[in-house]
A protein has these predicted regions:
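Short loop/turn motifs at secondary-structure junctions
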Residues: 4, 52, 132, 190, ...
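Structural signal for conserved beta-strand scaffold positions within catalytic alpha/beta enzyme cores
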Residues: 9, 117, 138, 213, ...
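His/Asp/Glu-rich metal-coordinating catalytic cores
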Residues: 20, 26, 55, 66-242
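N-terminal active-site segment of His-dependent metallophosphoesterases
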Residues: 1-73, 393, 397-398
Length: 421
């Protein structure tokens, strides 16, 4: 390559996505945090200008739903115009949340924006100062479901200096409805760089060639913890490629584990949470919604199972954060701890608690796959299962095993309370 190339890869912007838990923060921060996805994209646009990139690649799911709201579209186009004013080209593919069939408002894009078609893979030259420095390939979704393996349709043209493939896809599964493909499918296409969308966690799947998920620029709920952002990429004159992940999140979602071992009073427990909050504030330095997972074993287990007490703590901790810039809002508490008890010895006693533990022990001795199957069979055989609806059908193996463990200890607690009563 005679010239170097600079670009930003981002995707899964989800502009207009509702941001939950805003009732817990004051009005000033509701206005700021409420538009966090848009503000995260604003940071990307400003970064593109500051770094004088040649292109911004957007790998699908600009919006959250098929009827993407008008305000989100206006915000998006306004920021695209800002890139146009700085001579930065934009290349975008449409994903499952913003397929071609879902585009309703006729808001024209500036001339610097190229949307890849849905019918076939298109090759578009990236020209800098009159010289083609790269070729960009892409294909968009026509509908929200795309069962075809689109990766098979990509082929590098002879003579490309540097080839970039853009695709909204789920790598690693041929059964997905999101343009499923494998890592080998992508490698065989001859691209020098793959800019992928759909997965919200940033990850480099391969370095030869680079196959990259940028993730989303802003976490949307408590499952999307950690830094969120985009990749800034520099390609040297001879094709050497350097990547830098840059955090663009306006607000963070975080999760911490807090062991209750050795904690013997409610005041100690509350102080431990307060100390953990301050550490998160120092480390992150921006508004944060925090999940606290209580682990270990101790006398505070029973207190943590009291919903009135935990709700009171949540309310008081939230009140402490009002008016703070880098607030750390404890969004939820999860009791993954255990009471102080030797289950092996307790199960030997000839009573209802011992019998209960022996039944659980038989399940726990199963291999993980067998245990999950047994638990699902038990769950699905119950008439109440249908009432769970989509939640029940979406229950992951991990969540099922976690619930099983929690149920064991809750059952022991209830049986012991009944015996004392």
């Amino acid at each position: 390559m005679a010239k170097s190339l600079r670009f930003i890869q981002c995707g899964d912007l989800h502009l207009g996505s509702p941001f939950h838990n805003l009732a817990a923060i004051d009005e000033r921060w509701q206005r700021i945090v409420g538009k966090a996805p848009v503000r995260a994209f604003q940071k990307i646009v400003q970064m593109a200008i500051d770094k004088r990139v040649h292109a911004v690649l957007i790998t699908g799911d600009v919006y959250t739903s098929a009827d993407h709201n008008l305000t989100a579209q206006l915000d998006y186009v306004r920021l695209l115009h800002k890139l146009a004013q700085n001579n930065i080209q934009v290349f975008a593919v449409l994903g499952n949340h913003d397929p071609l069939e879902a585009w309703k408002a006729k808001i024209p894009f500036p001339p610097n924006v190229h949307i890849f078609p849905t019918e076939s893979v298109e090759r578009v030259p990236l020209v800098v100062d009159g010289e083609e420095v790269a070729a960009i390939y892409g294909q968009s979704y026509a509908k929200s479901e795309q069962r075809e393996n689109l990766a098979w349709k990509f082929n590098r043209a002879a003579g490309d200096r540097f080839s970039i493939g853009m695709l909204h896809t789920q790598v690693g599964s041929r059964e997905s409805t999101y343009a499923p493909c494998t890592l080998e499918d992508l490698k065989e296409c001859g691209m020098d760089y793959w800019a992928l969308g759909h997965i919200h966690k940033h990850e480099i799947l391969c370095e030869k060639p680079y196959i990259v998920y940028a993730g989303n620029p802003q976490g949307l709920d408590c499952t999307e913890t950690g830094p969120r952002g985009c990749y800034y990429v520099e390609v040297g004159p001879y094709g050497t490629t350097d990547l830098e992940f840059i955090d663009t999140s306006i607000v963070r979602w975080e999760s911490i584990d807090l062991a209750i071992d050795g904690i013997e009073s409610v005041s100690e427990l509350r102080e431990s949470v307060r100390f953990a909050k301050e550490k998160v504030r120092r480390d992150i330095g921006k508004p944060t919604f925090l999940t606290v997972n209580f682990t270990g074993s101790g006398s505070m287990y029973h207190v943590l199972n009291n919903p009135e007490a935990t709700q009171y703590w949540l309310d008081s901790w939230r009140e402490e954060e009002q008016g703070k810039y880098a607030f750390v809002m404890v969004e939820r508490l999860r009791n993954l701890a255990r009471p102080k008890m030797n289950l092996g010895e307790r199960s030997k006693l000839p009573d209802s608690v011992g019998d209960y533990l022996n039944v659980f022990d038989k399940l726990e001795k199963l291999a993980p796959e067998e245990k999950v199957k047994a638990l699902r069979d038990i769950l699905m055989s119950r008439p109440e299962f249908e009432r769970l609806g989509t939640y029940g059908r979406a229950l992951t193996d991990e969540r099922l095993l976690e619930t099983f463990e929690k149920a064991k200890w809750l059952g022991v607690q209830k049986l012991l309370e009944h015996r004392r009563g």
